[in-house]
């Protein structure tokens, strides 16, 4: 074997080649990587000095536990936003920085960045992947861009119009249930419980053309979705269980995978049946049969859509997008509508004005049903919805981790790789963005009052390339359900003030309870 003298390095006499040389090079490479990381961290820390920091709880924990997912945590966040209106820096332990942005003028650079640059924070979204696969909520890069383009037609007005009939029907079922409960002496109702089932009922009909009657009787599929949502929210608060290997060994992990399998089996069965039906009928006959029913459901659209190269979505991709829509569509809409009902219950003047607007719209109409064209004829009701979404945004925060440095409008830089939280709740409650932000005032959204506001001052559906693709669907459903509810019921606040609970969506501890009184025909 050839010999190599390393005495000039001070490493002694001749040594064997190549193993010692490879070892030296390997050690040098590792050292170089360590030094590179240390330098990058040092450089990042210097650039992060431009972001103000609240006092740390202690040197080891940093700011961990300072803003908790509780009512008190939201109050602390509101205080921080008042103190640091542009945003602030917090630390997870001694080494992990997290930037929170809470002003509409500052978030523009990140929200408008391409999906390839402003990636979703993988730590949280990874725990959704066993359930939602590579759906729009979880996927990134080229796959996300391709799916986004292919799914956009599913939310075209012509597709959404027939869904308004479904929204009416599902709301009618919920109201019939309310009247029965009230007649039995139960006028105090948990809005989250009832509205969640109503939105799931609508979604199952819009996505699968399937009626499980879930508002009146138990459904394994609906129960599995509710369980998955609860388990994901619970796991989100337990960072040690983010590791799949550990989580899968827990009782919650086993329940999660059992519920996942049930949901996947249901979706797969629907897709297989549609795949079988489509070639039997042929595309033209399939579309004719759908035209007669006047409804093309979400699965139909996904089966028929093709990309620029004429390629279809795989069955796995269709399942991922359908499951994603069921998850995102029911929770966020249920939260939004529940808090709208709460805010109007607390302000009878606004509630009555909305009611009169609906009564005038539906005067002499039989049956009392909201149609697609009606949705644009409810300006004050729409203002009330938007103000509630400002005060109680269903999604309180979104996270990004950028692949390159992001220059903010004020000249500061967010270094690549740093977790950045865009606090929707913070922006909506920022007194430098919204005067008197804790006051429910629908007139903020009067067209004259809002015309000069930043488009990023109100972002309940996010903004930019990765905004919510289903926001028109959600707004339409909320308008229909709210209009019919105010037409038939008077909403009154509960004796106990709710305590907000920001999980995956903004909930209320122990439910969001209201008292509900049916309106007589004369009162209507």
Curated annotation (Swiss-Prot):
Cofactor(s) essential for the protein: heme
Cellular compartments per GO CC: endoplasmic reticulum membrane
Enzyme Commission identifier(s): 1.14.14.94
GO BP terms in the entry: arachidonate metabolic process; icosanoid metabolic process; leukotriene B4 catabolic process; omega-hydroxylase P450 pathway; response to toxic substance
Highest rank taxon of the organism: Eukaryota
Keywords: Endoplasmic reticulum, Heme, Iron, Membrane, Metal-binding, Microsome, Monooxygenase, Oxidoreductase, Transmembrane, Transmembrane helix
Tissue specificity as recorded in UniProt: Expressed in liver.
Activity vs pH: Optimum pH is 7.5.
Membrane-crossing segments per the record: 15-35
Listed CDD domains: CYP4F
Compartments in which it is found: Endoplasmic reticulum membrane; Microsome membrane
Lipid bilayer topology: Single-pass membrane protein; Peripheral membrane protein
Leader sequence residues: none
InterPro entries, per the entry: Cyt_P450, Cyt_P450_CS, Cyt_P450_E_grp-I, Cyt_P450_sf, Cytochrome_P450_Monoox
MF term (GO), any: leukotriene-B4 20-monooxygenase activity
Residues annotated for heme binding in this entry: 328, 468
Main localisation: endoplasmic reticulum
Catalytic activity: (5Z,8Z,11Z,14Z)-eicosatetraenoate + reduced [NADPH--hemoprotein reductase] + O2 = 20-hydroxy-(5Z,8Z,11Z,14Z)-eicosatetraenoate + oxidized [NADPH--hemoprotein reductase] + H2O + H(+); 5-hydroxy-(6E,8Z,11Z,14Z)-eicosatetraenoate + reduced [NADPH--hemoprotein reductase] + O2 = 5,20-dihydroxy-(6E,8Z,11Z,14Z)-eicosatetraenoate + oxidized [NADPH--hemoprotein reductase] + H2O + H(+); 8-hydroxy-(5Z,9E,11Z,14Z)-eicosatetraenoate + reduced [NADPH--hemoprotein reductase] + O2 = 8,20-dihydroxy-(5Z,9E,11Z,14Z)-eicosatetraenoate + oxidized [NADPH--hemoprotein reductase] + H2O + H(+); leukotriene B4 + reduced [NADPH--hemoprotein reductase] + O2 = 20-hydroxy-leukotriene B4 + oxidized [NADPH--hemoprotein reductase] + H2O + H(+)
Anything else known: Highly expressed in aflatoxin B1-induced hepatic tumors.
Function: A cytochrome P450 monooxygenase involved in the metabolism of arachidonic acid and its oxygenated derivatives. Mechanistically, uses molecular oxygen inserting one oxygen atom into a substrate, and reducing the second into a water molecule, with two electrons provided by NADPH via cytochrome P450 reductase (CPR; NADPH-ferrihemoprotein reductase). Participates in the conversion of arachidonic acid to omega-hydroxyeicosatetraenoic acid (20-HETE), a signaling molecule acting both as vasoconstrictive and natriuretic with overall effect on arterial blood pressure.
Family: Belongs to the cytochrome P450 family.
Protein name in the entry: Cytochrome P450 4F1
């Amino acid at each position: 074997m050839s010999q190599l003298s390393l005495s000039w390095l001070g490493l002694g006499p001749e040594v064997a080649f190549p193993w010692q040389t490879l070892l030296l090079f390997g050690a040098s490479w590792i050292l170089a990587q360590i030094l590179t990381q240390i330098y990058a961290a040092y450089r990042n820390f210097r650039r992060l000095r431009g972001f103000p920091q609240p006092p740390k709880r202690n040197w080891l924990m940093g700011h961990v536990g300072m803003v908790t997912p509780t009512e008190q945590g939201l109050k602390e966040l509101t205080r921080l936003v008042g103190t640091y209106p542009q945003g602030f820096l917090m630390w997870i332990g001694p080494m992990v920085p997290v930037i929170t942005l809470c002003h509409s003028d500052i978030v523009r650079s990140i929200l408008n960045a391409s999906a390839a640059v402003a990636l979703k924070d993988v730590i949280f979204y990874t725990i959704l992947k066993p359930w939602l696969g590579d759906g729009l909520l979880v996927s990134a890069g080229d796959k996300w861009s391709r799916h986004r383009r292919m799914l956009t037609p599913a939310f075209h007005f012509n597709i959404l119009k027939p869904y308004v009939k479904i929204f009416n029907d599902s709301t009618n079922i919920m109201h019939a249930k309310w009247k029965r409960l009230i007649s039995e002496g139960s006028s105090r109702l948990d809005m989250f419980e009832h509205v969640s089932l109503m939105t799931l009922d609508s979604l199952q009909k819009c996505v699968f053309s399937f009626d499980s009657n879930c508002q009146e009787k138990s459904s394994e599929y609906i129960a599995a979705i509710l369980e998955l949502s609860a388990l994901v929210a619970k796991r989100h608060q337990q960072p040690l269980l983010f590791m799949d290997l550990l989580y899968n060994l827990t009782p919650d992990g086993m329940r999660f995978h059992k519920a996942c399998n049930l949901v996947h089996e249901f979706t797969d069965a629907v897709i297989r049946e549609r795949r079988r039906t489509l070639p039997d009928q042929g595309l033209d006959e399939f579309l004719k049969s759908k035209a007669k029913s006047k409804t093309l459901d979400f699965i139909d659209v996904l089966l028929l859509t093709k990309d620029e190269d004429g390629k279809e979505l795989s069955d796995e991709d269709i399942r991922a997008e359908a499951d994603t829509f069921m998850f995102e569509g029911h929770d966020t809409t249920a939260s939004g509508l529940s808090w709208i009902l709460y805010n109007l219950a607390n302000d009878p003047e606004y509630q009555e004005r909305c009611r009169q607007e609906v009564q005038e719209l539906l005067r002499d109409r039989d049956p009392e049903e909201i149609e697609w064209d009606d949705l644009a004829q409810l300006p004050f009701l729409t203002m009330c919805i938007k103000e509630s979404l400002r005060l109680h945004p269903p999604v309180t925060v979104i996270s990004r981790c950028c692949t390159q440095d992001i220059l903010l409008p004020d000249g500061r830089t967010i270094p690549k790789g740093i977790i950045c939280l865009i606090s929707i709740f913070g922006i909506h409650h920022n007194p430098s963005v919204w005067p008197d932000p804790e006051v429910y005032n629908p007139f903020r959204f009067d067209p004259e009052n809002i015309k000069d506001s930043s488009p990023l001052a109100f972002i309940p559906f996010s903004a930019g390339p990765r905004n919510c693709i289903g926001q028109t669907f959600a707004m339409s459903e909320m308008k229909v359900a709210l209009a019919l509810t105010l037409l038939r019921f008077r909403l009154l606040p509960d004796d106990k003030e709710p305590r907000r609970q920001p999980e995956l969506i903004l909930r209320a501890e122990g439910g969001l309870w209201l008292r509900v009184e049916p309106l007589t025909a004369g009162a209507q």
